[in-house]
């Protein structure tokens, strides 16, 4: 996420750092700040809020975990839900039985339609960038959207080259990528 280049870093000595971006009158912190210990959260926020004041910005937070809510609430923050996040244990996902019926149907249809799924290693992504860029632009145009950047990301060749990319592609000649998702692995390869 740091490598996307659309966020700045704020450091507070040895205490920690956070990703942020100034948007209008706000200094918006993205995700949890990284601190040496939970005991240092309050002091880190004090320094961060002072930094926001130096920039004549009001601090705001986006996508922080529940661990930070009590500390922020003590500073007068109110919260509202914005978006969804899911964690799925892949070991529990099955194509068997009633629970997997919908997924089996999707896979059979994809096979009938001549589609396959694969994950491109970072070294192979560069060759597909023109197709991926075109798919991204077409999707944005169809949805009448602009690149989201800060929270959802944006298409960037250099960023795409660094990570694996999941693709759905046609199996008929000429093979063409139909859709994609860049993959960012979490700690110990336990999250994507």
Residue ranges and their predicted role:
Residues 31-39:
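Short histidine-centered catalytic/ligand-binding loop motif
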Residues 39-50:
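Conserved acetyl-CoA-binding loop-helix of GNAT-fold acetyltransferases
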Residues 1-32, 57, 62-79, 91-105, ...:
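A conserved beta-strand-loop-helix scaffold within acyl/acetyltransferase catalytic domains
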Residues 51-55:
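Conserved short hydrophobic interaction patches
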Residues 80-86:
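Conserved catalytic-core motifs of GNAT/GCN5-like acyltransferases
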């Amino acid at each position: 996420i740091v490598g996307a280049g659309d966020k700045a870093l704020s450091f507070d000595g040895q205490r920690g750092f956070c990703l942020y971006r100034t948007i209008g009158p706000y200094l918006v912190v993205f995700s949890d700040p990284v601190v040496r210990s939970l005991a240092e959260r309050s002091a880190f926020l004090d320094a961060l809020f002072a930094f926001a004041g130096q920039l004549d910005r009001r601090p705001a937070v986006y996508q922080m975990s529940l661990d930070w809510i009590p500390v922020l609430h003590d500073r007068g923050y109110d919260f509202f839900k914005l978006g969804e996040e899911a964690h799925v244990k892949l070991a529990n996902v099955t194509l068997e039985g009633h629970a997997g019926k919908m997924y089996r149907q999707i896979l059979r249809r994809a096979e009938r339609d001549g589609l396959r799924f694969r994950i491109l290693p970072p070294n192979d992504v560069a060759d597909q960038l023109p197709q991926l860029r075109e798919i991204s632009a077409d999707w944005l145009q169809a949805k009448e959207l602009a690149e989201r950047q800060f929270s959802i990301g944006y298409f960037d060749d250099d960023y795409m080259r660094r990570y694996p990319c999941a693709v759905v592609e046609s199996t008929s000649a000429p093979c063409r990528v139909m859709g994609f998702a860049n993959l960012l692995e979490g700690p110990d390869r336990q999250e994507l």
